[in-house]
Amino acid sequence: MDNFLALTLSGTTPRVTQGKGAGFRWRWLGHGLLELTPDAPVDRALILSAGIHGNETAPVEMLDKLLSALYSGSLTLTWRVLVVLGNPQALAAGIRYCHSDMNRMFGGRWQSFAESDETRRARELELSLETFFSSGQARVRWHLDLHTAIRGSHHLRFGVLPQRDRPWETDFLAWLGAAGLEALVFHQAPGGTFTHFSSEHFGALSCTLELGKALPFRQNDLTQFNVTSQALSALLSGVETSTSFSPPLRYRVVSQITRHSDKFALYMDAQTLNFTAFAKGTLLAEEGDKRVTVTHDVEYVLFPNPSVACGLRAGLMLERLP
């Protein structure tokens, strides 16, 4: 299965759907779904996902290179892994999504959207995770969902962590730092993201990794993400990652800006970068009689997008943590 990406993009079913790699077994579970199981018993399970948005191609190319290293034997596998290319049709078309944003649909929220390829795919991915985690006795469960951002950012690489009732494990946060993430953003409320689903339903340590900016296939400068690729290689092979990195800055979400109607106006232009700072009292958005202003001394914007569909998030406001 050294042509997983090509098969996924073409929508082709392989003639052989399971086989042996270098020290592991592989199973093709469906378009964009590949399970890898080491020959030696392991108690760690990892979801590696990318392509939930079809125009975010750099992480897909990164995963393809990791798979090539595993099949060639230059990389040893020490985790059970489910590789997920989230939205094959959108990836093939080079668009963010075909009908609706799948990363708002998980946790059963797909039932609230008009039926589409994305709602069916979200349901399929939920079932795939349930099957994967229930078929083993993993003591450690991780989910790394790789993305790129629509906008530029004051932090080239950053992570977004779902709301979680328990403290985050230090080795997980340390690995995120070793992977080159410059900032970590902690959600304070549930959401429809893939990582919130895996965390809430299966207890996985989950993070959405935002790596640079969305570009078409073969236009990505993957050298920008060498540190992340190296950390992923070390993780898969069970090698300790470097500890000589600057700890990521930490932020928490303090509010969400939501577009409810065509009267919505977001007062940020197309050049506003992620993590741009705004002072207390700054008017951020208006919608009819409703005004959204900065309530803390300083807040930072994440994912500003004035053109989202009504009812969806037009931005998150953050505060820095000590």
UniProtKB/Swiss-Prot annotation:
Binding of Zn(2+), residues: H53, E56, H147
Family to which the UniProt record says this protein belongs: Belongs to the AspA/AstE family. Succinylglutamate desuccinylase subfamily.
Cofactor details (free text): Binds 1 zinc ion per subunit.
Keyword field contains Disulfide bond: no
Function: Transforms N(2)-succinylglutamate into succinate and glutamate.
Domain of life: Bacteria
Top-level class of the enzyme under EC nomenclature: hydrolase
Cofactor needs: Zn(2+)
Catalytic activity: N-succinyl-L-glutamate + H2O = L-glutamate + succinate
Expression induction: By nitrogen and carbon starvation, and arginine, via the ArgR and Crp transcriptional regulators.
Matches recorded under InterPro entries: AspA/AstE_fam (IPR050178), AstE_AspA_cat (IPR055438), Aste_AspA_hybrid_dom (IPR007036), SuccinylGlu_desuccinylase (IPR016681)
GO molecular function, one term: succinylglutamate desuccinylase activity
Pathway: Amino-acid degradation; L-arginine degradation via AST pathway; L-glutamate and succinate from L-arginine: step 5/5
The entry's keywords: Arginine metabolism, Hydrolase, Metal-binding, Zinc
Name of the protein: Succinylglutamate desuccinylase
Gene3D superfamilies from the UniProt entry: Zn peptidases (3.40.630.10)
CDD domains: M14_ASTE (cd03855)
EC number of the protein: 3.5.1.96
Location of the active site: E210
Single Gene Ontology BP annotation: arginine catabolic process to succinate
